[in-house]
Each structure stands twice: as structure tokens, then as C-alpha cells.
């Protein structure tokens, strides 16, 4: 279980941030929780801050940050420990349009070095940052879609695949 945890970075829809901590303190704390050795901790925190555009706000208290910067802090903590897989749950929810563009760009950049799984109900978000989409319906995999090759509109495809099946009683009406 510990080996699996070390390979995965996770950002929940509502990142569990400690508003009274500075960004630096929080990232150091998470790195320690993830078992990053003390000698590597400072380097990993700075690398995660650099990749997420947080270098300038490391000394700031988290409660003073905008929602977009808080999301960046959440993504930075997911990068600590150098995971191969990063899971992002609704990473742009509640962000303004400029922040959405910044986070999308960051996710695409992360995809160059990591496997990124994006969980989202916002299909335009999926189209903007993903190569493939896995569509789930009632807890089951309904389709794997290569977004570059798919000619149909993703929203239409989603509705087609997830529409409730008509029962024989309804067909008679």
C-alpha cells in the first residue's frame, strides 16, 4: 500500500489546505507526510513551487491567496514525492476564466512528465486538456474515447452513452 501511495499524487475537489500556514510551511509539511527525506525536501518543495508558479507566494499565508493560487498549492502538494500518476478531481471548479486557462495550461504541462487522470463533469474541460476520455455510466466504463480521432461532439456522445435505457413498459406507451 505504501509503494502504491508513493506513486500517486492526488488533488481533491476541495484541497485540504491549512489556511493559517504559509505556502512554504504547508508544502514542507505535506512533503514530510509523504515521506520525502529531509535532505530532499527543500529541493522538492522548490521544484513543485516552480512548476506550479508559486515561487513568489511561498512566504504568504494560504488564507490570503486567491482560489486559483490555492488550486496551484493543491497541485503542488500532489507533485511532492515525484509521483508517476497524478489524479486531479475537478481542478478548475470555482475558478474565474483566466484562472481556468492557467490551470489547463499547467495540467497539459504536467501531462508531459506524468500520467494525469482528470476527473470532471465539465466536458469542455476534458476536451481542452485530455488526449483520451473514459466515460463512466452508473459506475461502469461505457467508452474509451480518443479525443483527437473522435468526430462526434463529446457532449452528444456522453448523452448517448449515459442515457437511461427505455423499459419495455415505456415503449408500449
Regions found by a protein language model. Name each.
Residues 28, 32, 39-57:
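Conserved ABC ATPase "signature" region
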Residues 61-68:
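Conserved ABC ATPase signature
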Residues 75:
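Hydrophobic anchor residue at the start of the ABC signature
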Residues 80-84:
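A short, proline-enriched helix->beta-strand linker immediately N-terminal to the Walker B motif
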Residues 86-90, 95:
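Catalytic Walker B motif of ABC-type/P-loop ATPase nucleotide-binding domains
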Residues 100-112:
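Helical segment within the ABC ATPase nucleotide-binding domain
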Amino acid at each position: 500500500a505504501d509503494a502504491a501511495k508513493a506513486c500517486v499524487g492526488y488533488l481533491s475537489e476541495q484541497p485540504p489546505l491549512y489556511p493559517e500556514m504559509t505556502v512554504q510551511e504547508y508544502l514542507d509539511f505535506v512533503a514530510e507526510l509523504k515521506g520525502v527525506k529531509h535532505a530532499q525536501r527543500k529541493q522538492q518543495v522548490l521544484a513543485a513551487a516552480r512548476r506550479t508558479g508559486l515561487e513568489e507566494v511561498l512566504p504568504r499565508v494560504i488564507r490570503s491567496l486567491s482560489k486559483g493560487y490555492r488550486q496551484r498549492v493543491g497541485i503542488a502538494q500532489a507533485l511532492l514525492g515525484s509521483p508517476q500518476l497524478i489524479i486531479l478531481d475537478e481542478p478548475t471548479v470555482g475558478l474565474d476564466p483566466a484562472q481556468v486557462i492557467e490551470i489547463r495550461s499547467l495540467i497539459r504541462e504536467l501531462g508531459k512528465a506524468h500520467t494525469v487522470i482528470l476527473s470532471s463533469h465539465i466536458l469542455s474541460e476534458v476536451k481542452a486538456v485530455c488526449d483520451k476520455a473514459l466515460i463512466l455510466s452508473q459506475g461502469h466504463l461505457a467508452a474509451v474515447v480518443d479525443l483527437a480521432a473522435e468526430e462526434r461532439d463529446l457532449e452528444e456522445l456522453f448523452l448517448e452513452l449515459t442515457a437511461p435505457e427505455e423499459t419495455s413498459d415505456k415503449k408500449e406507451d
